[in-house]
Amino acid sequence: QTNIDLLKMKIPNKKYITNKESGSKIIQYIHDDLSYLVKKDRVTYKKEYLDFSKILKERLEFFDEIAISNTLNFIQDIEDDIYIKFNITELQRVIDNNLSNAIKYSFAKSSIFIKLAYINDDEIEFTTTTHSKKIENVKKIFDDFYRENIARGGFGLGLKIVKDICDKNLVIINLDSNEKNTKFAYRFKINEDTIT
């Protein structure tokens, strides 16, 4: 990463620098997913009060280079100072897998809409909305190794990780997909405990 930063200082705004940085971030994201899979059954992921708004903005900044290299952009609607009781590693896996999939499956030169907002005094909702092909098999999309479009790459593990984390933490998932848009919505209780 340091070498890429030096190149950016010497040759600013070059497309191949963006692509190289994008590639390094994809590798880091995949590593984080695999690391979680290896550790999840033998590590206790303790909860703490987290600034969801701040973390989401930081992850959007991380994925911005990847979006740009895929001719996409993020449009954010994030309420400030939304705090929840959650584990930082698990929250990041939920966010990262959704942002990665949004980039992977969006139509070229389109926008990805990211929203985080209170829906009542006890619950918040995190949503990603993309202009993309309709998901044909909604029931299987969260299964191990399932991929709607093999040509898009990936391992088919990301959404399984997301579902396991959401089930464990009582996060409600809603998926709406049609011919024009796909929307993933995650409803978090602000002080929810895990399933014992």
Question: How should each PLM-predicted stretch be described?
Answer:
Residues T2-L6, K10-I66:
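Conserved DHp (HisKA) dimerization/phosphotransfer helix of two-component histidine kinases, i.e.
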Residues E48, I68, N73-Y83, I119:
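Conserved catalytic submotifs in the C-terminal HATPase_c
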Residues A102-I103:
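Short helix-loop "hinge" at the ATP-lid/N-box region of the Bergerat-fold HATPase_c
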Residues K109-D122:
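Short beta-strand/loop element within the Bergerat-fold HATPase_c
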Residues R152-I161:
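Glycine-rich phosphate-binding loop
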Residues K134-F145:
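Short conserved segment of the HATPase_c
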